[in-house]
């Protein structure tokens, strides 16, 4: 009996000795290919606004990888173009705010002034630089009160590089690209064959296998929403792809960049009835849903209710953890803000700079059903939740 009990320890000792003398390789295992964990569709979407840019400079590979690690459903990006027609991931049409372009003396003569949506904007515009030149620049954090240690570490990435990040993720991660400033891009960048900026965006998506109507089998394999503040661009690409589209909504007093209408006009019931032929949802600025006065949120408008009545999803922007952005009603607590918008306002997705906090809130308040088929999968899910804290 004693010898029997000791046998496992003896075998363990032998294995340890053997392992010290040579490299052990796992035996080959035959089995099906790994199936990625699918996108959840049972609770509001966690949309990583420019990646996890509350922690790492926006629109960088590191920011997107961090967002995936923290549990995002979608990684969001803004699409602009270089001078030579390469699609890049960058938010502003000028490079000044979030790159070190000013320190590159060789580019000092590139500063220009252009009309951008009725405003004269001066700076270093993306479309005045080739991709090779843009790759020499490095990204920096937009806000001074955020972590500055990553400034100067990461380059601008192309749209195709962004798509490979989603493709190579360990689970199904959706993408949420914005067709940014299409009027401006089409004015200053010319593509062969008379193609438009919008054509290039859709062509690139198709090249990487994106397509399919919302919640179709094809869509669920590679989830995608295409967003834009320009309604005519969304109508135009409806002839090119059946992928779901989202109309972004700015301050209601602002005019759209491609029509003579204000955003107040395009949030009317009559306009919703028209645009729902082309889009599956709207992406409003938060203050168009819930007005703010002296940093207090007021009574909500009926925008969400009316959008839902027209079978349109609502994905507001942008949710941020810092006190500079949190309204007093929420006592500097981002979880209170998430609770308000999800459970009282009833939104269908949230653009957030802090993917981790939104993911934690949803896991605590509306955990997904356990679809694990093995203890290994369950341990992997637990590890993904614990990892951010282990690194802290």
From Swiss-Prot:
Gene3D superfamilies linked: Phosphatidylinositol (PI) phosphodiesterase
Enzyme class, broadest EC rank: hydrolase
Location of this chain's protein in the cell: Secreted, Cell wall; Vacuole
InterPro entries attached to this UniProt entry: GP_PDE_dom, PLC-like_Pdiesterase_TIM-brl
Domain GP-PDE positions: 44-362
GO BP terms in the entry: glycerol metabolic process; lipid metabolic process
EC annotation from Swiss-Prot or TrEMBL: 3.1.4.46
Signal peptide (residue range): 1-21
Primary localisation category: secreted
One Gene Ontology term, aspect cellular component: extracellular region
Molecular-function GO term, any one: glycerophosphodiester phosphodiesterase activity
PROSITE patterns: GP_PDE
Top-rank taxon, per record: Eukaryota
Tissue/organ expression: Expressed in roots, rosette and cauline leaves, stems, flowers and siliques.
Glycosylated residues, chain numbering: 120, 239, 260, 329
Chemical reaction(s) catalysed: a sn-glycero-3-phosphodiester + H2O = an alcohol + sn-glycerol 3-phosphate + H(+)
UniProt induction comment: By phosphate starvation.
Keywords: Cell wall, Glycerol metabolism, Glycoprotein, Hydrolase, Secreted, Signal, Vacuole
Xref: SUPFAM superfamilies: PLC-like phosphodiesterases (SSF51695)
PANTHER family for this protein: GLYCEROPHOSPHODIESTER PHOSPHODIESTERASE GDPD5-RELATED (PTHR43620:SF7), GLYCEROPHOSPHORYL DIESTER PHOSPHODIESTERASE (PTHR43620)
Family of the protein in this entry: Belongs to the glycerophosphoryl diester phosphodiesterase family.
Descriptive protein name: Glycerophosphodiester phosphodiesterase GDPD5
Species in which this protein is naturally found: Arabidopsis thaliana (Mouse-ear cress)
Organism taxonomic ancestry: Eukaryota, Viridiplantae, Streptophyta, Embryophyta, Tracheophyta
